[in-house]
């Protein structure tokens, strides 16, 4: 099986290590695995065989600026996402396993449109935080914010 993880980082931080731990286990079971990531940071040598970068540091910075100006987190990075999806189309994963989609590196609308075009793919989403369902607040309990329930 061909597995594609999508996460903000690869091999570093908590979610990056979770992805690489899963990748190693899946590979040991005979699967082919790639981890698409978007944030800068050095991918440790032993995990570079999995790593596929989405965009550049400049793309992330532009997405962050767009987010600050227009409150559109997750809707920037159109060119980077388009190029990544071209690569993913060629890779043809059997399973797409989503992790952290926030981090100014991928356009979620384009990503989900692509996923919808491939009903044959399995999709899993590990929710490491609350960003996906709160209007982009990853840790609402920590900051004691309940606005996401009515108007965020």
Where are these regions (language model features)?
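N-terminal subdomain of nucleotide-sugar transferases
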Residues: 1-48, 91, 117-121
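Short catalytic/ligand-binding loop motif for oxyanion handling, primarily in non-cytosolic enzymes
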Residues: 12-14, 42-46, 104-107, 131-142
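A short acidic, amphipathic alpha-helical/loop segment
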Residues: 18, 109-114
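A conserved catalytic-core segment of Leloir-type glycosyltransferases
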Residues: 28-95
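Acceptor-binding helix/loop patch of EC 2.4 sugar-transfer enzymes
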Residues: 63-68, 125-152
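Short N-terminal targeting/anchoring amphipathic segment
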Residues: 85-106, 121-128
């Amino acid at each position: 099986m061909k597995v594609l993880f999508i996460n903000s980082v690869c091999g570093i931080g908590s979610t990056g290590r979770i992805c690489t731990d899963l990748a190693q286990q899946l590979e040991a079971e005979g699967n082919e695995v790639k981890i698409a990531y978007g944030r800068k940071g050095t991918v440790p040598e032993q995990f570079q065989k999995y790593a596929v970068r989405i965009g550049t540091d400049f793309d992330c910075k532009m997405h962050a600026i767009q987010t600050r100006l227009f409150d559109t987190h997750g809707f920037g990075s159109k060119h980077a996402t388009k190029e990544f999806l071209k690569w993913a189309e060629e890779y043809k994963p059997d399973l797409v396993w989503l992790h952290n989609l926030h981090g100014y590196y991928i356009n979620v609308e384009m990503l989900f449109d692509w996923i919808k075009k491939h009903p044959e793919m399995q999709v899993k989403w590990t929710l490491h935080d609350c960003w996906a369902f709160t209007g982009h607040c990853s840790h609402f309990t920590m900051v004691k914010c309940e606005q996401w329930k009515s108007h965020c």
